[in-house]
Amino acid sequence: MMACGLSKSLGLSSSLKKQQGIVSILGGISSNTSSAPSLRRTFSADLSSKTWVSQNGFSPMKRISSSEKLRPDEEEAEEESRSGVDIWAQIQQDKNDKKKEEEIEPGQSDVWSSILSEKKKTESSKDTVPPPYVHPLMKRASSLSEKSLEICTESLGSETGCDGFSSHASSETGDAEIEIHDETNLVVNVTETKVEEITETEIVVEQESSIIVPNHIIELPPGSFPPPIRSLSSQSGSSLHMKTRRDNGRLVLEAVSMPSHNNFSAKRQDGRLLLTFAEISNEPNYDKEDEIDSEVQWFDEEEEEEEEEEDEEEEAPDEFAYKPNGLLYKMAQKPIPITVHRLAHKPIGVPKRNSRWPMADEFDTKSDLSTPVVHSLPPRPRVAQLARSTKPPSTVDDTVGAACFNTCDYSWKSTNTESFGPNTKTQFQAQNFVNKSMGDGWINGCKDRRRSLLSVEPFCIAT
């Protein structure tokens, strides 16, 4: 009994103590212990909700400065947790994207990688500058010997850099004297095939053997071919000219000495190029006997040609021939073959315009010496002389014809030997010869209309 009383008293005292502590914290509450909730239940509830506190009979909590400070700290922690979650989600998304890229076909990835690599190569090549272009002749010039370089400056007087035809061209000697110290050996792989016959099958065995070929320069013998130009000159003044001729289907080259055409000579003095006037002392001396022989041969050819022309003239028929009517005509000459020698020795001069007029020697032989040679139209006859020589006109037609006299008709009129004396026959023959020979030149003038004798100007003029 005593124990039960003690436990009850202890329970009451503890409850009172607890109530005292809760009352001091939460405020005034009812003295009924059954209505008050337990401490475990109160702490597990959401203290932040005001509805629960009001339903259970608790007064709202009083905020102090410490609780106000704790609220923004909680908000910052929530923001940090959210930012951490966002970062983690982003990392997971990146991993998923990489997995998707790896799941793409490998062929496409290879193409893309090759494109990227080529792009990188092109960019790198643009950055690097290509090496400068060097002409092959410039490369070869770097390996020339000192002598060949001296020839370029010392022997500028001649075209090839040599003093005469006996000496060889500079290009030949310079190339032959090139010395290469770094001689390399070339290794050539030669495949030798050997066929071995074994019973019924053929087996081809290839064996590779290395053959060492020394790299050396083959020197050409001097003067193996003629110089590349047609003439060679020297400082002495004389020069050589390459003359070509054909002999039995072969090309023959001959060196002929010719006078020099160089006006300047080049010398090297104290490292400078000195140009001076060339003094040509060795002039070509021609033999007088050769000149005399050539002149005699030329005169002999001229005499032979003259003799041939004389023989042709003797064999040819007379140029003049008489016809039955008493007129004198000139026969056409036969064409004589013209040779090259005649054309060469033919004298050059002003040719005669009137080629059809006869020469004076021909008239001397064929006609009287008293008759003058006519080189133009016959003089116009006077009216009084014509009136005496002709009979008086009997009809009207004769009077009209006498009034309208034309010189062209007169020149073409046949000769009347009865009215004139016998001494005038040769004169009219000569005039008729002239009229017949020069009739072609008067055709244009004779076609004009007849004019009266009152016109003083001569109409038909030979030009």
From Swiss-Prot:
Location of the region described as Disordered in the Swiss-Prot/TrEMBL record: 57-135, 298-320
UniProt biased composition (Basic and acidic residues): 117-126
Pfam families the record matches: FAF
S-S bonds: none
InterPro entries: FAF (IPR021410), FAF_dom (IPR046431)
Family to which this protein belongs: Belongs to the fantastic four family.
Presence of keyword Chloroplast: yes
Protein's name in the database: Protein FAF-like, chloroplastic
Domain FAF positions: 224-278
Annotated transit peptide: 1-44
Compartments in which it is found: Plastid, Chloroplast
GO cellular component, as recorded: chloroplast; cytoplasm; endoplasmic reticulum; nucleus
Biological process, per Gene Ontology: negative regulation of abscisic acid-activated signaling pathway; negative regulation of phosphorylation; positive regulation of phosphatase activity
An MF annotation (GO) of this entry: phosphatase binding
Principal place of residence: plastid
Bias kind Acidic residues: ranges: 298-318
Protein keywords: Chloroplast, Plastid, Transit peptide
PANTHER family per UniProt: FANTASTIC FOUR-LIKE PROTEIN (DUF3049), PROTEIN FAF-LIKE, CHLOROPLASTIC
Top-rank taxon: Eukaryota
